[in-house]
């Protein structure tokens, strides 16, 4: 694989997608947005945090692997686990106690739009789409201020029994509280010492403490559901936030009620526009029962596309009964990319999907069901476009418009990602999934699926890591939909 060739392909793909985007009528994005309080940690910050506790207590809590943040010691333990492995993690907190403790003992550098649906809505708005309909069940006045003022982002609001699309600043629910998540970012090569043990952080990443207040419900307003046609025309929907569903609620309802309602929304969207494609963006889901329910009851058979990272592939495989493959994905090693590929194929089969898009540091894998309306090159272009967007976001911290996104073209293609793909070539050619020439283009042909593998652009020292995965998935999905619309128009 020639790195210069891939640089050229990125440029060509970016301009092809730019040309296709105006063909889209609009996108629907739901459900989760919040305010992110972001702190970039230094070694001094870490020493201070560790210093608040007895180090043997920290070690015990690390070994216990807390799955929620019930007290500050849980937070420090999960932070050390995340830093040791260099892996992103999202851990829920069900009270405001940790929020108050962090404000008092650490503080944040700045606040911005958070939550997958919020981040994706703002990105699509800035890419200049005609219309982006965002829907957040808990839209507060403060939260509404974090939507970008591009004029093309709208939110449904019920007025006198009628659903109208209005700018978020005119569509919020009065008197509702805001959901605030803490994002603790850390850098590669930071030295960490606790209880006599020292390690070096292997890569830039972050720990997210996800606020899950008791009043939070992942649901759609009944009147908005009944008048869902007011959202149209839209060409696609990107849905996320299902990780917020709880097993049981104080009012006696359970996760089953919210799963059922979520599926009803998906099915109604599809009935209103049979051409509509729906993408679910996965994230870290600590609760295994909820993780399995999301995959087998919401995603399987109901949506077209799934976006996720390496850890999420492993976690999904695990609850679907593929423990050995899951372990192989998470362990990485020399066969890591082969396991990741096999895992993505398995997810497509198990969940009956049209498309599975996996983003890993340095490369992306996209598995496609046979009979998809685009050529492999057109699919590849959509992935390369998203690679440029992600590079621009990592480089500058955000993307204000398509012109600014071009900065991503200056970021080099990852040589490590390219090397990972070259190691995978023997696996593909050995199984006759492609010829060496086809692999040079990133194309793989299975008996029941096709696949595209591309090396991505990677910023050595990113300004921010939050939202990069959402940018990759959203950029690729809308570029794909735009190309389908452009082809249908015959232009």
Swiss-Prot record:
Keyword Metal-binding part of the UniProt annotation: yes
A biological-process GO annotation: glycolytic process
Class of enzymatic activity (EC top level): transferase
GO cellular component term of the entry, any: cytoplasm
InterPro entries in UniProt: ADP_PFK/GK, ADP_PFK/GK_arc, ADP_PFK_arc, Ribokinase-like
Enzyme active site: 470
CDD domains xrefs: ADPGK_ADPPFK
Cited Pfam families: ADP_PFK_GK (PF04587)
Taxonomic superkingdom: Archaea
Sequence intervals crossing the membrane: none
Keyword Glycosyltransferase attached: no
Official protein name in the record: ADP-specific phosphofructokinase
Gene that encodes the chain: pfkC
């Amino acid at each position: 694989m020639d790195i210069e060739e891939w640089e050229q392909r990125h440029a060509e793909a970016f301009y092809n997608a730019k040309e296709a985007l105006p063909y889209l009528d609009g996108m629907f994005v739901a459900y989760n947005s919040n305010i992110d309080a972001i702190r970039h940690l230094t070694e001094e910050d870490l020493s201070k945090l560790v210093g608040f506790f007895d180090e043997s207590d920290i070690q015990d809590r690390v070994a216990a692997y807390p799955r929620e943040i019930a007290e500050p010691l849980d937070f420090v333990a999960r932070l050390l686990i995340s830093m040791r492995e260099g892996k992103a993690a999202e851990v829920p907190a069900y009270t405001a106690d940790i929020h108050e403790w962090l404000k008092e003992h650490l503080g944040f550098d700045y606040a911005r739009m958070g939550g997958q649906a919020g981040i994706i809505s703002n990105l699509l708005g800035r890419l200049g789409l005609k219309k982006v309909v965002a829907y957040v069940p808990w839209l507060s006045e403060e939260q509404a201020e974090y939507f970008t003022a591009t004029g093309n982002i709208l939110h449904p609001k019920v007025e006198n029994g009628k659903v109208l699309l209005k700018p978020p600043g005119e569509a919020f629910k009065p008197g509702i509280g805001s959901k605030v998540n803490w994002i603790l970012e850390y850098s590669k090569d930071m030295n960490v010492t606790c209880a006599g043990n020292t390690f070096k952080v292997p890569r830039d990443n972050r720990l997210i403490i996800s606020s899950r207040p008791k009043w939070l419900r992942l649901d759609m307003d009944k009147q908005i559901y009944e008048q869902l046609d007011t959202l149209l025309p839209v060409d696609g929907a990107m849905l996320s936030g299902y990780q917020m569903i709880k097993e049981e609620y104080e009012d006696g309802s359970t996760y089953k009620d919210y799963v059922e309602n979520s599926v009803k929304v998906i099915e109604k969207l599809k009935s209103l526009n049979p051409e509509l494609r729906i993408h679910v963006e996965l994230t870290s889901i600590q609760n295994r029962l909820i993780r399995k329910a999301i995959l087998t009851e919401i995603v399987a058979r109901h949506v077209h596309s799934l976006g996720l990272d390496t850890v999420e592939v492993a976690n999904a495989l695990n609850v679907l009964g593929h423990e050995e493959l899951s372990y192989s994905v998470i362990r990485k090693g020399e066969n890591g990319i082969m396991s990741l590929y096999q895992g993505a194929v398995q997810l497509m089969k198990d969940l009956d999907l049209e498309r599975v898009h996996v983003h890993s540091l340095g490369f992306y894998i996209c598995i496609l069901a046979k009979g998809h309306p685009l050529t492999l090159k057109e699919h590849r272009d959509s992935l390369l476009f998203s690679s440029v967007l992600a590079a621009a976001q990592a480089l500058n911290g955000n993307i204000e418009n398509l012109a600014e996104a071009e900065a991503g073209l200056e970021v080099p293609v990852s040589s490590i990602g390219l090397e990972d793909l070259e190691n995978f070539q023997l696996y593909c050619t050995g199984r006759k999934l492609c010829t060496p020439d086809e692999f040079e283009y990133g194309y793989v042909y299975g008996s029941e699926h096709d696949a595209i593998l591309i090396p991505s652009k990677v910023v050595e020292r990113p300004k921010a890591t939050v939202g990069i995965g959402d940018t990759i998935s959203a950029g690729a999905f809308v570029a794909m939909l735009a190309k389908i619309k452009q082809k249908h128009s015959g232009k």
